Amino acid sequence: MKIKSIRKAVLLLALLTSTSFAAGKNVNVEFRKGHSSAQYSGEIKGYDYDTYTFYAKKGQKVHVSISNEGADTYLFGPGIDDSVDLSRYSPELDSHGQYSLPASGKYELRVLQTRNDARKNKTKKYNVDIQIK
């Protein structure tokens, strides 16, 4: 009985501490009528990351460009086992810098720093352009 209580306490502690490191802004991406892209700006510090969520359909292509080379972009969503690196030279992208979405549903784009810069608690400003075709 005591072991179950300890396991629950450890799990709760892990959940609470993991979310505290992920402070940042959450944005629901809105594409204006007749437009397939949206632009946002932000600032990340240390291990924080900003999250941009959007809905897309299987087979659509997403292209992300970011103004700060020191910021990384990763995509999470249906049909993606872990995450997909959407940075400029990622092998996941086609020759046009686009990633073909594997399933329909809600996707989450995270903008974060490299581990080295996060450890140094650096702050980075960025502009991001998200396109869905």
From Swiss-Prot:
- Chief location of this protein? periplasm
The molecular function terms of the Gene Ontology recorded here are: lysozyme inhibitor activity
- Give me the disulphide-bonded residues: none
Is DNA-binding tagged as a keyword? no
Note the InterPro entries from the entry.
Answer: Peptidase_C_arc/bac (IPR007280)
Q: Does the keyword GTP-binding apply?
A: no
The positions making up the signal sequence are 1-22
**GO BP terms in the entry:** defense response
Cellular component terms, GO, for this chain's entry?
outer membrane-bounded periplasmic space
* Localization in the cell: Periplasm
Pfam families of this UniProt entry?
Answer: PPC
Per the record, the domain of life is Bacteria
Keywords (A to Z) from UniProt:
Periplasm, Signal
Q: What does this protein do?
A: Inhibits activity of g-type lysozyme, which confers increased lysozyme tolerance to the bacterium.
Q: What is this protein called?
A: Inhibitor of g-type lysozyme
Gene source species: Escherichia coli (strain K12)
